[in-house]
Amino acid sequence: MRARCSAFRYCPSPLGIVTAEQLDKLDFDGDSMLIKIGDFECTEVWDGVFYKKLSNYPEVSDWEIRTIIEFMEYEKKYGRTCDIECDNENTLRTVLDGIKRKEAYLSAPCPKLLTECTACPYRKGCVTDFVCHTTSVDNAIKIFECGKLLSALNARQVPVETLINENRNAANDPADYFEYIMLAWGNCQAGDRLVMERSLERFPNDNDLSIGFNPGVRFYFQYEKLLSHPSSVCDGVLPMKVKDEIILEDWVYKIVIPTKLKAILEPHIPNSLMDRVIYIDNDCKDICAQTET
């Protein structure tokens, strides 16, 4: 059975909104996802649960309703249904009303600054002009040599079952997630954290993220432009993701490389991308300052 509802959950018809007591009597199959709406640390998907943080809980904005709808539409595409849970029944009913009128909400404009995540102390939110993909120096060499960003499935060339069962899949992501290139907002630190985590083979500590911080290589894209990519998808969790591959020459805006990696990476960079490369010194005090350079 799925995790117990804290207050109210919407289940697909004919159940409708049920209470925690009613939920305890129900069973759910493995092809359903749970959307939990609340005041969490961040928005993320973890072990079959979409934790949707609201910037001003219990109020929910049109944009936030849009992202919930996008998540449901993406999951539906891959045969998964969604239940929705929220402590506040009024918030839940507002979201359900938005889902009924999804076409109106899917056109809600993206704010210039998203304040649901406040991990960045400088901007106090996510700046939405750009999205980026951050990677390690070894992976950057492979990317430059093939001229593309590739999904994990295409880059690794192993069965998807192998990717699903790896320890690095701590979030228990389903198979289709590995078919996409993941993109974060331009000033997001999550990509660098993940690169360090995989390099260290453990979660980075405060020292790793400050005086011991080693930034990855960042590939920046203009958000509005990349939305027009024929394989782009908005899944409600990330700003967007792109299926299979992104050809750099066609889409990349800037590539930011730590200066200390210049000698290693420059021989591998195609001439067609040289004018889009920026080298920066890592003279910042921590990971958050680095994302602002």
Map each language-model feature to its residues.
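Conserved NAD+-utilizing ADP-ribose enzyme module
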Residues: 2-117, 122-125, 178, 190-293
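Conserved hydrophobic/aromatic beta-strand scaffold that supports enzyme active sites
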Residues: 134, 182, 218-220
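Short, extreme N-terminal leader segments that mark the start of a protein/domain
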Residues: 106-154
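Glycine-rich loop/turn
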Residues: 52, 58-62, 67-70, 140-198
